[in-house]
A protein has these predicted regions:
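Acidic catalytic motifs of isoprenoid enzymes
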Residues: 1-189, 197-220, 231-267, 278-285, ...
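Membrane-embedded alpha-helical segments that form the functional core of polytopic membrane enzymes
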Residues: 221-226
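Surface-exposed charge patches
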Residues: 227, 275
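C-terminal transmembrane module of eukaryotic multi-pass membrane proteins
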Residues: 273, 288-289
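A glycine-rich phosphate-binding loop feature that marks nucleotide/adenosyl-phosphate handling sites
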Residues: 290-295
Length: 318
């Protein structure tokens, strides 16, 4: 769920990379101020992108300051100035980590779940106080997603023959069924990111006139990004989920078919993000936003595809 929304550093100018890194460090320091030092280990690219994206519509911003880091206290580098928007991006993504911990707990992954629940319980409580309607939307979407996943897993286990054979042996009907299942499941994740983007936009000091015009674009992008992350996570975990009998939206497909479908679905969301990001009136950092969407996402998709192909090659050799 986290760690997929990355820049592609070789295509960034030095000043743009310095800016991105300053925001990444600011998010990390914000986590430390709000929740203590250990949660800083969870600093994510997703929180950094959320802060970067909405700060790009703000004309004025305090200058970055040279600061040392707990990981490298002897060397100072630019860190973006503290900002309520950075704090909110840190808070909301930390609360989502808590939600992921609850999901892992339901899956029986105690070793992963308990540290997340312990470290980010405060974040979940703080977000509920600050944005109760957002939390209600997130919790409803995640609850419905878990219910859908349990239902689909039960159905699949009830027809093991269909789920154990590649779709090419059963015709295209199963492939289409899996596509619909994957898109339905991803839509819940899309609802989460749409709600997050919408709430963050309201806090981003975008003028009322602009906010009214841009809110629809933000929500479309949030939906597409949430769905892309869901597909990325599903592709990344497909082999582990199959081995442990857990739900995966691509279950029932052969490895080759799974990869083809995942790439197709992810490309479609990348196209949506690219088309709508191009419509936005940035004051700054447009090149970094474009780098993430047009370079970072496709290359992360390619990395996941290469991982799947490597597993498939190993499986064939065995």
């Amino acid at each position: 769920m986290f760690g997929y929304i990355k820049i592609y550093k070789p295509e960034l100018l030095v000043r743009d990379y310095t800016r991105y890194r300053s925001l990444y460090c600011a998010v990390c320091k914000s986590l430390g101020r709000q929740f203590g030092q250990l949660p800083r280990l969870s600093v994510s690219y997703e929180a950094t992108f959320l802060a970067l994206f909405f700060l790009s519509f703000r004309e004025n911003e305090k200058e970055a300051r040279d600061e040392a880091c707990i990981a490298n206290p002897l060397v100072k580098h630019p860190v973006a100035a503290p900002d309520p928007l950075i704090d909110f991006a840190s808070l909301v993504t930390a609360a989502l980590v808590y939600g992921k911990g609850q999901d892992d707990l339901e899956d029986g992954q105690w070793f992963r779940a308990l540290p997340q629940l312990a470290l980010f319980r405060k974040a979940a409580g703080t977000l509920r106080k600050e944005a109760p309607e957002l939390v209600d939307e997130i919790e409803l979407a995640l609850h419905e997603l878990r219910a859908f996943e349990r239902m689909e897993l039960s159905l699949c286990q009830g027809r093991e023959a269909a789920c154990a054979h590649p779709a090419d042996k059963l015709g295209t009907a199963l492939s289409e069924q899996v596509r619909k299942r994957a898109e339905t499941a991803a839509a819940y994740s899309g609802r989460v990111l749409r709600a997050v983007m919408s709430e963050t936009a309201r806090r981003a000091e975008v003028s009322g006139e602009w906010l009214a015009k841009l809110q629809g674009i933000f929500e479309i992008m949030g939906t597409a990004l949430g769905e892309w992350i869901y597909f990325a996570d599903a592709l990344d975990d497909a082999e582990k989920d199959a081995a442990k009998g857990r739900f995966n939206p691509f279950m029932g497909l052969s490895a080759i078919e799974r990869l083809a479908l995942a790439e197709q679905l992810m490309r479609k969301r990348e196209e949506t993000l690219d088309a709508h990001a191009a419509l936005l009136p940035y004051y700054k950092d447009a090149a970094i936003v474009q780098n993430v969407i047009c370079e970072g996402l496709p290359r992360e998709r390619a990395r996941l595809a290469d991982k799947s192909r490597a597993f498939l090659k190993h499986e064939v050799q065995v």
